[in-house]
Amino acid sequence: MLTLRKASDRGLANHGWLKSFHTFSFASYRNPREQGFSDLLVINDDRVAAGKGFGQHPHRDMEIFSYVLEGALEHKDTLGTGSVIRPGDVQLMSAGSGVAHSEFNHSATKPVHFLQIWIVPEVAGAKPRYQQEHFTAQKKRGRLQLIISPDGHDGSLKVRQDARVFAGLFDGKESATLELPANRYAYVHVARGSVELNGQPLREGDGVRVREEQLLTLSNGVDAEVLVFDLRPQELPEMP
């Protein structure tokens, strides 16, 4: 069963320097029907103006990853990490027992467009850690590349939860099929462009809850970039 969450139905926070679309309830946006899905708690589609960003702020007991679509995002944290995240890079910060970080647009002239995604961890109070990896467009072209997993399989980043995240690029006749293990949920998010999921047309910003499906086929893309989350079969996130 596929349940569509239209891009136009998302929450919107427009602060001038920041324009953020919220797939699920976040900050001042509250929707009782959209409180997350399985262990997936947040998908924020953020556009940050040149030279602007989020000052240092704390997190704990959350798996937070950033996926840059355009521009460059500068990250600093209390673990001593300093990095710049660009398209193709995936950054995963496991907040664990507590960490503070800042994120700013690295450019003084161009905006940055990125997704920030939160996954609830399976254990509380773990040691904080930071990971970053680059996945080339070639690895994602016409296929679903594993970018996050519990065990770091195929060069993916390790997440502290029974969740897997795939990224793919699709255009024209390119297609890929993901076989889900039995009794799993999934969530599909179209980061940009348009694509079909099992024949259902999707546009940029659309999301789909997936239940009781074994095969997910992405096809007929137009400059599409897609994230697919393989998740535990539960409706709402539960903090550890």
Task: Please tell me what each predicted stretch does.
Residues M1-P240:
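Jelly-roll (double-stranded beta-helix
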